[in-house]
Amino acid sequence: MGDLESARGVLRDWLELEPGNAEALHLLASAGGLPVPVRASDAYIAEEFDAFAKSFDAKLEILGYKAPELVTAALASALSADDSAGDVLDAGCGTGLCSVLLRPMARRLDGVDLSRGMLSKATERGGYDDLECAELTGYMARHPSRWDSIVSADTLCYFGELHDVLSAAKVALKFRGLLVFSVEAAASEITGFLLQHNGRYAHARPYIEQSLAAVGLELLTIEHDTLRAEVMRPVRGWIVVARNSGIHRA
């Protein structure tokens, strides 16, 4: 409790010097000093990832980051033996860590991210047919029935409320299209979502299941796995595969 009080004090001092600073506002909310937002702000995401785009891949290698491998393996398992992933969206593509894994499965591979710094790295890595700098929910909503598969590795952990982003994904998927994503797993006593002190959200399995059902996405599989290590401890998450079965919800 004392550490959190100290952190809130530091963050409030920061905001006095820089009113409206997106990082300070988000971290203060994660420390319990402000109401929890339903998702991280666009400004926080863009500034946070622009700041460490150059060191992003090296840092994640140290942490044993596995989310790209886990989500692409889940996509491959959901496809029938003769199917490709078709037209694929890498949703929150970052530096393009998924591209080398998705490219062999995809007829076309598009990427979208809010951070221009991360997109610059993705361009250098290659493998994409198109890269766009945009907010994910709005971007998907503007492209109805565009993709056969949407893959999102560790992007939805910056969303607490999942309804809008999942609804947009359903709009963007073709009929029978697949959505594969990872999120961090909340502790067993949590029934919805939680903004953690690290600034990322964690989600409970029942909440994920309810959110998918609410927008008319059919849950195919949900697996519990280790996404990476943090402070020498495994970070557990959910690997989710859902299908657009054409069910319509209000």
Residue ranges and their predicted role:
Residues 1-47:
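N-terminal auxiliary segments of SAM/dcSAM-dependent transferases
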Residues 200-216, 222:
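Short alpha-helix
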Residues 163-175:
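A short glycine-rich, Lys/Arg-flanked "PGG" loop and its adjoining helix->strand segment in the class I
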Residues 89, 94-140:
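Class I SAM-dependent methyltransferase SAM/SAH-binding core
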